[in-house]
Structure formats: structure tokens, C-alpha cells
From Swiss-Prot:
Species the sequence originates in: Mus musculus
Sequence ranges assigned to domain Fibronectin type-III in this UniProt record: 612-710, 715-812, 817-913, 917-1008
UniProt similarity note: Belongs to the immunoglobulin superfamily. Contactin family.
One Gene Ontology term of the molecular function aspect: cell adhesion mediator activity
Name of the protein this chain belongs to: Contactin-2
SUPFAM superfamilies, per database record: Fibronectin type III, Immunoglobulin
Domain Ig-like C2-type: 39-130, 135-224, 241-324, 329-413, 419-506, 511-605
Superkingdom, natural source: Eukaryota
Alphabetical list of Pfam families matching this protein: fn3, I-set, Ig_3
Signal peptide segment: 1-30
Gene Ontology annotations of biological process type: adult walking behavior; axon guidance; axonal fasciculation; central nervous system myelination; central nervous system neuron differentiation; cerebral cortex GABAergic interneuron migration; clustering of voltage-gated potassium channels; establishment of localization in cell
Amino acid sequence: MGAPARKRASLLLLLLATMALVSSPGWSFSQGTPATFGPVFEEQPVGLLFPEESAEDQVTLACRARASPPATYRWKMNGTEMNLEPGSRHQLMGGNLVIMSPTKAQDAGVYQCLASNPVGTVVSKEAVLRFGFLQEFSKEERDPVKTHEGWGVMLPCNPPAHYPGLSYRWLLNEFPNFIPTDGRHFVSQTTGNLYIARTNASDLGNYSCLATSHLDFSTKSVFSKFAQLNLAAEDPRLFAPSIKARFPPETYALVGQQVTLECFAFGNPVPRIKWRKVDGSLSPQWGTAEPTLQIPSVSFEDEGTYECEAENSKGRDTVQGRIIVQAQPEWLKVISDTEADIGSNLRWGCAAAGKPRPMVRWLRNGEPLASQNRVEVLAGDLRFSKLNLEDSGMYQCVAENKHGTIYASAELAVQALAPDFRQNPVRRLIPAARGGEISIPCQPRAAPKATILWSKGTEILGNSTRVTVTLDGTLIIRNISRSDEGKYTCFAENFMGKANSTGILSVRDATKITLAPSSADINVGDNLTLQCHASHDPTMDLTFTWTLDDFPVDFDKPGGHYRRASVKETIGDLTILNAQLRHGGTYTCMAQTVVDGASKEATVLVRGPPGPPGGVVVRDIGDTTVQLSWSRGFDNHSPIAKYTLQARTPPSGKWKQVRTNPVNIEGNAETAQVLGLMPWMDYEFRVSASNILGTGEPSGPSSRIRTKEAVPSVAPSGLSGGGGAPGELTINWTPMSREYQNGDGFGYLLSFRRQGSSSWQTARVPGADTQYFVYSNDSIHPYTPFEVKIRSYNRRGDGPESLTAIVYSAEEEPKVAPAKVWAKGSSSSEMNVSWEPVLQDMNGILLGYEIRYWKAGDKEAAADRVRTAGLDSSARVTGLYPNTKYHVTVRAYNRAGTGPASPSADAMTMKPPPRRPPGNISWTFSSSSLSLKWDPVVPLRNESTVTGYKMLYQNDLQPTPMLHLTSKNWIEIPVPEDIGHALVQIRTTGPGGDGIPAEVHIVRNGGTSMMVESSAVRPAHPGPVFSCMVILMLAGCQRL
């Protein structure tokens, strides 16, 4: 007997011996043991920056892994395993490492956590513990810094020793008077130095550098000694920019980091800063007119050369540097937990990206893995041949470059298992359709893979025209008939053992389509019903499914277009509501039971607006015209009638219809000329097609093109000016936007002359963003009118000239002081000031007067100032101290500044009013009036006299309060009979002003009585405030 025959006989004996056991009612399967798995990190240590001066007495590095059985933990410092004994400074709490009383000398370094259980060991990513510090500034006095007013200056910070980097601010004279970040001042966050582009008198003073360290646990700031900035006589000359704060020629950055380039220049006028990317374009989200260029999250696309340009009317200066972008390792492909059969081969692979390119190595149970025997290590590949049980364990792929290290972990479980059907037995009942085909899988759990054999009853099945056993053990029976019913058993065997599983095949009637859907043509927006009816085996449930071009139709989508018929189980009609172009195609109706199915197709054609044209190409580019061509898109079953062309430019980004030649573009055209474009402008174009059913989606945008240059066609606007230093004519205008520049090399051409003069002077000002020009000449008198015109130019020529505007040269301060200044206190907190006005002079337009006042005994430098908003010759000054003598001067002012001071005048404010309100209020009531009486208020020696009393009265019928004055300590006021309540306030008045009020609240009680509530309140807010309440009752004319 041959080997195949012996094997078949052996399996037959196994079949006969086990069939009774399989069918025995006492047969059962025991449950598997609880799953075990190796450590998987849930929390890994992260780097810490610990302040050397911290009050904290410990540092915790976290580590936690999920594992079964639970993991145990070890730690390494700088690659050496740590001795974590009880009572030492290093304690293990769970998986966390706690370092007590950390110091830089003993504890700074690289830490790793190791988690282990019987399955294997994994190591965590590395965590670096660093120690931060910030020392104090030197106690030595700083030398004064001297320069000329109008020059630029740099004040060095010279920060103390520190780690890591700092942030910087500067103080002027006192805290918290911080130097603002504006176009004239700049604080370098690289060096801490303070730069002033052009100094002026307001910069005089003492400066201190404030350095701040931001650590993980705390923030610390230190101040430098003050350094005095002294300014020599002003140098009125203009200077071209000179860049003083420069970014380095090369700046390295990691992907995702923020990159900051610094650039600041000295110059007069103050230079404007502009940034550009030499070999690309800047993101619109980045600030491009600031001393710093910040890239919030740098990417490889941001690598390149960047240029900073500082420009003013006297010239320009530039600096360039390159940003080089690198990256930490990042996984492209990682390993995953794997179960493999004993004796099989396995190939694991991992791949990482990074710059520089990462190196890859492997660990097994936390130890380096090298090629040996059956294991081959090839960079990112790990290969096993003929796996055995000892290969099980925890594996890690490690990718590293100079910027970091990453770990990918996986468990390898090598299995040796006898065939086992407990998790995946053969189906007990296997229904099949007559005339159809059935596949019965046999997939026992086994390692190595089991040999499969099938039987029907006691007959071993082999391959035939109707029966096939596939390589994976699946039994396939075709053209099924009633004779195929019965028990089918799958036998599985490997060197570990044998097993089998049985199922019963039951043959049912086939499913058929009795009414198939019909093809149809519809328009967009129409409704359509596709019919589909079927017959089936009555013992089974029937379901209908629909597909469109082999994709399932979604009936449950909210707001969808499909509805399903639900009249009868054998009817599966599909209705399309408000059909769209995307609903056209081949629909398939499938009627299915659990054993078989039948299907029929129908084609739905949906007519609609045309699809987008394609291939939009721009050629024959002129200054205001281009020629467009395109290819026809789908007409969607309705002829194209016409085309519409649109364009957009970068400034607006909005698509607008353009003029064309021909004006109306017919449906058979594939080219047209675009008219009326702007010269030297970037454009994108798109094309839309229309038919009788509407206009379709536009084409994709064309490639961006730039029209040719032309002479500017529009004059600049907003011509004005004035101001500046003596001897200067400052001319301002509105910079022309990109769409009106018409070409490169753009700038402005100014013409100006003294009013009445015959000859014009000209000045050429480069730069589209320039918005002012300063002409300096010592011969220019203050506030001299000039006639000014402006035009723009580019490299193609000069544009049209604007209308003439009158601009005045810089004003000078008034030369004459006001005379006959008089001042007198009008209350305890106010005084009146008057003066004889000065005449308008030729130095400028007088805007008003500045009143300076200070207390006797103080210096004039401490004076407060108020300005009039017009040319009034008197004013009231408020907010003064009571019973205080003040000195007062008055000066005229214009836009250039204030003139000389008048001789000082003196004024004495009044004593304050009495702080006591009127008390002991009594009353007499009649039907139409209320008489109130109170004790006279006697002022103290430090209070002003009382000349009378003010009474403020308001009732619910009269929302506007009425003021009554009396020089006596009583008053009678009318009280309408129909009021509900009224409010009365009584206070003293006199030379020192009004005193604190006593408030009386009157509420009518019935027809003949009212209640009076009295309280003394401070006049802090307008609403009624009640305290120290006194309640009186008014009843007829009697006093209680």
C-alpha cells in the first residue's frame, strides 16, 4: 500500500473513531487560560528643566506600562542601571523614579525606564534631566552711553550667566515704565541689547535691562544696574539705514519649531523693515514689516534664503541668511504584535524619516540584537528563519539621529498548537440554494498549519468537477442538488495532534428576479422609480440591496435622494428624488437570502448642465489682453450653448467675469480673447459652460500668469503734508496698491515750489510702499505754503500727474507768551484762569493754550498741564487740592510745540465745604406743600463758610429733578396730592462748594399721610444710597 493510501486509511479510521464522540451529548470544550502579554508603555518619562534654586525637594520621572502579568521596573542613568535601594536618594514608586534633593552634579543626565514581565522587557524613550539657573547682574555701575540726538544707539544688556535662554525687556527710569516695541525701539531677544533707530529728547534717562528665565517649575527675573543715556546737540542730517541687529548667515531649525529672525537698523528718517524670501514666497500669515520675522511652525518648505531690507528716503541696507530645516526621526513604518507558527519564517520591517537620515537598530528584551544563526539584522529589516519557542519575547525597533531617538515595540509569540476548532468550528447548519454554489471554510487554530481532509458521512471527498477542496481547506460544492444534503466533517492534523468539526448541509429553493428595473433618461431635478420584484424560498427571509456603479446606495443619509419601497417583502423598488448628475449610471438590484441571491441591472441617464471645461491655457500675453483656450468638458447629454470666462487676482482672490472678444462665446468655441486686464498683474482664469439646463461647474484655474508692463495710468491720491522739524517740508501721499503699479521699478516723482514761485523742484522717491518725503533746506521759513504735485513711475515711464495741493512747511513754536494772566480759586477743587490772547503769527496755526499749575513749594517740573481745545482766553481748572496755593502759567501752542511761558499768577483754592450734612430734619405737611426745617450747619475752622442750602426735589410724576436754593435753614416745596413718593436731597453750599447731602424719601401712606426716610450720603454716585435710616410718619398735620 502506498503512502497516500495509508494516509487516507489513517484519516478514515480517525473519522470512524471520533464521529460518536463528536455527536455525544456530553462533549464540551474547556476555556483557555487568561491571556498574557508583554509590557506596553502607557506613560513614559519626559525631559525636565529643574531650577537649581527651586524650593521643591524632589523630581519625579513617570513610567507606567500595561502588562499581564503586571510589569516590574528598573531604571538606567546615562546607560548604567541604577541601584534603587530603600532609603537612598533614588526611590521607585510604582514605576516612577523619584529623586530626592536633586543636584546638578549628581543627577543631571539621561534616564530610561525598563519594564519587564515573563513575556519580555521593553525600554522607554530617553528623558534628559537638566538644571536651569539665572545669576544676578554685575553690581558694578554701568558707564553712561553718549550719542548725538538724531543718531542711532545700542545699549548692551550683557546678561549674567544662565541656562536656558532668556527673554528681555528694558526699563526707562523706573518700574514699570517699559520701553515700547515700536518702529523706533527694538529689544533683541537673542542678545538682550536695546536698539534705538533714531534718538530724540524723549530718550534721555536711565535704562535697566530686565532678564527673565522661564523654567518648568518657576519664573525668575533680574535687573541690571541703570545706565544713563546722554544726548549731545542734535544732528539734523539725514542718514541712510545701517543694519545693526543682524540674523546669522545660517540658522538651523527642527520641523515644527518656531523660528525667529531679527533685523533692525539705525537711520534718519527711521528706516522701514521689509522681509522677503529670495528663493520663494513668504506666507501671508507671517509679519513682513517688523524687526522680527517669525515662522510659527517651520517646515521643509520654509527652507531657503531670507533677506531683510531696511529703507528710508536716503537709501537702503540689506542682510541675507539661510534657514536650514532638519527633523527628528519620525516613523514611516512600525512593527506590530505578531503570532507566528513554530518552524515558520518571519520578516519584520520598520522605516523612519528624519534629517539627517536616522540610523536603525534592534533590541530584544531591552538588549541589542545582532545577526546570529537563524536571525539576520539588516538595518530596518529583521528576519527569522525556522522560528522556535525561544524566539518569543519583546522586540523594539530604534531609529535615531542627532536630534532624537524613537522606539517602536512589538511582541513576538511563537506558537506550537494542536488543531483546535473551539474558536472557529464548522457551521452546524449550512443552507444552500439548489443549482447554486456553496463554500464551507475549515479554519481550525493550529501551529504549524494543519493538513485538511473532508468527508460526507463515511465517504472521503476528493476533487471532482463539482467538488473542490482549496489549499486553505475550504470545501466548495457547485450545481447543488437535493442529493448533496447531509453531514460534512473537516479533519485537521499536524505533528501536535488531530481534531475535527461537522456541519449539516440543507438545500433550499433558488432566488429569482421576477420584475427587473428598466433603463431611463431624465433631467436634473426629476424623480424616478426603478422597479424590482423577486421570488424566493418561503422558509427564508428576502432582502433587497441596490448599488450604483458597484457602490452601495445609501438610503439612510440625512437629506439623501434615495427612498426604498416597503410595501411587500418581495418588492424592492428604488425611488430617486430630485436627481442630480451624480445619480446617473448603472443601477443593480440584488435580491438576497442567506444562501443565494439574484440581480438585474438598469442604466439611468441624467441630463444636466455641462461639466467643467478642461485644459485652460493662457497664451499671447499682452499688457491688457490675453488669449485663452480650453478643451470641451462633458455636455451631460445636452448640447453646450455658450461659455463664460472669469479671472481673479491675488489682492482680491474673488472671481469676476471679464470682457471678451467675441462678446458672446458660442458653444462650439474653444478659444477667446480676454480684454480690459490690468498691466503687470498676476491673473488666473477659468471657464464655465452653459446649456439649456443651466451653467455647470467652472474649470480648474489656469496657471498663474503676469500681464506685461505698461506706464502707470492713475495718479497717486491723498496728497497732503506738514509737520516735521524746522526747515523741513514733509509731503505725504497714499501708497498705490499693487493693481495700479503697472510695472516693476515703481516709485513716485514729486514736484514742488514755494507758492508764487515760477520754478519747480523735483524729487524721485523709489519704492511702492513709500508714503512720505522730507525736503530739508535751512532757507525754508516756518509755515510757508508750497504747491505740490505727484505722479508715479515705473521702468516703462511716468504716469499722469495729480492736481496741485497746498502743503505748508514745518511750523515753529509760538514766539510770544500770553499776557495779563489772572487766576482765582472758585471752589475747594477748582480755579478760574484767564489771559490776554496772543496774535496769530507766521510760524504756524495757533491751536490753543496750555495751562501749567503746581502747588506752592513744589518745583515747576512737577506741574500738571491742561490744554484748551480752541482759542478761548479763559478756562476752569478742576481736580485741585482744597485750601492750597497754586502757581499758574499759560503758554500758546501749535503743532510744533508750546511757546514761552507767561509770568506766573497765584491762586488760592477755597476751604472744603463742611463734611456734616444738615441734621435733625423736621417737617410740616399740608395738602399741597411740604415744609422742611433742619439745624443750621456750623463749619469747622478748616471748612468754608455756609452761605445757603441747595435742595434737589424729584417725584414719580416729575422725572427731572428741580433745584431749589435758600439762604435759610428751612424751605417749603409744593407736593402734588397724587404723588406716590418723592426724593429730596438737602446740602450746604458756600465758597468751598457743595457739602454732603442729607436724603429724604417721602412715601404717601393712604390719602392723608406719607412716610419720610432720611439718611446722610456721600455724593459718590447718582442713585439713592440709604444708611443710618430715620423713619418719620406724616399723618394729617400732626407731628408724631
